[in-house]
């Protein structure tokens, strides 16, 4: 199923998902450094594998996908299937509501 069929996302619920599933490896704050994973500030509209100062896998660079709702929705279901060879160890979020909530949070948090 695509993002267009996803339930409406709740950014507050997404913030909790980010805190428990993502924050150990990612930050969303402007000017914050990278952790195990890249800083996600400015994520929407950016091409995969292009954040300055982060060492991406060749797979992430070569995928050359632009991050937006549709691509994130597919990626977050199963990162290793979407980008075989990615360094991201996270297995994915199987529930459409969880993905929609996380994307709603990221849209808000990575642009402020």
UniProtKB/Swiss-Prot annotation:
Keywords: Acetylation, Electron transport, Heme, Iron, Metal-binding, Methylation, Mitochondrion, Respiratory chain, Transport. One of its GO terms (molecular function) is metal ion binding. InterPro entries: Cyt_c-like_dom, Cyt_c-like_dom_sf, Cyt_c_1A/1B. The modification N6,N6,N6-trimethyllysine is found at residues 80, 94. Binds 1 heme c group covalently per subunit. Heme c binds at residues 22, 25-26, 88. The modification N-acetylalanine is found at residue 1. It is found in: Mitochondrion intermembrane space. GO terms for biological process: mitochondrial electron transport, cytochrome c to oxygen; mitochondrial electron transport, ubiquinol to cytochrome c. GO terms for cellular component: mitochondrial intermembrane space. Pfam families: Cytochrom_C. Belongs to the cytochrome c family. Electron carrier protein. The oxidized form of the cytochrome c heme group can accept an electron from the heme group of the cytochrome c1 subunit of cytochrome reductase. Cytochrome c then transfers this electron to the cytochrome oxidase complex, the final protein carrier in the mitochondrial electron-transport chain. The tentative assignment of Gln-24 and Glu-69 is based on indirect evidence (electrophoretic mobilities and comparisons with other cytochromes c). This is Cytochrome c. It comes from Triticum aestivum. The lineage of its organism: Eukaryota, Viridiplantae, Streptophyta, Embryophyta, Tracheophyta.
